């Protein structure tokens, strides 16, 4: 079995196959005419970035292949990854022809504190692979854009260093462990460093066998995340057919155990069903975080956007709902808000900005999304975030 694993890991991935096919075409006689720009290479400047999508080609050009693939890909066949983006096409914006949009405000109050925008930076791991200063650089860029950042439990730097890098608002994301003391130690360190909220991830009960084999090449070249605690031996090497014990651990009683130690809001991240949303509230969560992990956990899961309305109905206004997965534009943000989210988080887009241009790139991406949100609000006749409701959209989910 170990030999089969090694052979499988060495085989071409989907993206490698595409690259090989492109190389074959390039060598074809059909493409034998000399390219006058063959040796010309130019990376666009930051001031040329108009949409978030503009950052991805620059990111692709700058990063090693393994690092880019780790960030870009989804679980297994990537159905969920594709569905996340497709779901925004199932929601139309309803224009409002006559409306006074001369003054538009995007500030929102969340858990008693006011944010200038409903857009936050989602937790994402190992940003040191994208930029030498990793999460510290991300915090600088997010702070410059007046945007709250959620720091991943699997960050490349300690929470103390990340918090000291800038003065913006921070939350902390926790991957639960079986060792309760380890969970409590991590939460204490995060709150002592200045994190005012905690997001507990509940949607990584196992790791894709295919993805795990591909990602070992990346992980082997990076430092172990300093906030993650002790890492057990990877059980997938020895038991490829079972759930990896010792990695993540989820029981609802965990929320009961840690609630009293968290001074600010506590949210459960990775909720995709109304029943789980109700259980979040029953076990002391102050908010529900709707997410499918950006299509990186369960293949053939529903998109976050299509399940959002049902979860909103189940929650019935008792707690705020945070949303992520698939957001690339300001109109995407408005669609999620219209379907019931109080705020949204973006993951890949600020990572593109970080990899391409460092902190200024992060700031620019977030400012682009903010400008696009204001534009979409103007066209739909909404002058404040509170004015955005389901009448701003028309849905056609399959």
Protein language model features and the residues they cover:
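N-terminal secretory signal peptides
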Residues: 1-12
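N-terminal export leaders
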Residues: 12-26
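An N-cap/entry alpha-helix motif that binds or orients negatively charged groups
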Residues: 35-112, 210, 217-250, 386-388, ...
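Glycine-rich active-site/cofactor-binding loop and its immediate structural neighborhood
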Residues: 115-154
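Short beta-strand segments
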Residues: 122-123, 173-175, 199-203, 347
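A gly/proline- and charged-residue-enriched helix-loop-helix capping module
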Residues: 144-165, 169-182
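Alpha/beta enzyme core
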Residues: 184-323, 334, 339-342, 348
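C-terminal helical cap(s) of enzyme catalytic domains, especially alpha/beta-barrels
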Residues: 304-310, 355-373
